[in-house]
Amino acid sequence: RQYFIKCEEELHKVAPVRSAALRRELKARITVASYFKPMCAALEAYRAELGKNTFQHHYTTEANMLARIVLGGMTAKQWAQANGITGEPRDHMSTLQLEHLSYLEQSNITLIELGQGYHQRKAELIRLSQRWLARRMEE
């Protein structure tokens, strides 16, 4: 009986922590999803200003650039294959990876709207990523 009482006490200690972690993970997943469409819209508007059409591979290139920064040089597809993941890779990313990706997507929107080209944005996003990760390490 004491064993079950101790288990119940431990559960009451752990449950709020786990619940908070799950809420943070869900928030990160929703946030990263909410920035993707505006990023694509910003890219399309930027390319239209340049008189260029935007095709599917342009969106893929942007997504792959950000994924490579977050996932250690791999695209989301490569990362999923390397980790034996089926389905949507973002559904299997850690909360930290999702928060990192959403930060970069949000930053990329701003850089696109400022008229920066792909290579300039990529360099700036790598720099911003390093700063973001350094701040996270300090927490």
Specify the residue positions occupied by each region the protein language model found.
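Positively charged, phosphate-engaging catalytic surfaces used for nucleic-acid and nucleotide handling
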Residues: R1-E139
